[in-house]
């Protein structure tokens, strides 16, 4: 099963929903403009990480603002 185009992280100029504000984004400790998206899971429940090249201009349909809770990790 592959991700649909709407769930793919994509470039959107001047987006109101940047990855930087999304609870599923984990910042890169060495480069603040990059990060990882952890919203996708595979069939066994494991996290499928995606690299984000630019957290200010990238977005997807699964964007959620807020903080990631402990329950979201398990």
Curated annotation (Swiss-Prot):
Source organism, top-level taxon: Bacteria
Pathway entry: Xenobiotic degradation; toluene degradation
Keyword Transmembrane helix: no
Pfam family membership, one: BssB_TutG
A GO MF label: benzylsuccinate synthase activity
Stated regulation of activity: Activated by the benzylsuccinate synthase activating enzyme BssD. Rapidly inactivated by oxygen.
Induction: Induced by toluene, probably via the TdiR/TdiS two-component regulatory system.
Protein name: Benzylsuccinate synthase beta subunit
């Amino acid at each position: 099963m592959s991700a649909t185009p709407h769930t793919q992280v994509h470039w959107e100029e001047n987006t109101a929903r940047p990855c930087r504000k999304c609870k599923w984004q984990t910042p890169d400790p060495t480069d603040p403009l990059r990060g990882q998206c952890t919203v996708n899971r595979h069939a066994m429940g494991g996290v499928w990480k995606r690299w984000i090249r630019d957290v200010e201009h990238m977005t997807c349909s699964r964007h959620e603002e807020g903080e990631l809770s402990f329950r979201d990790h398990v």
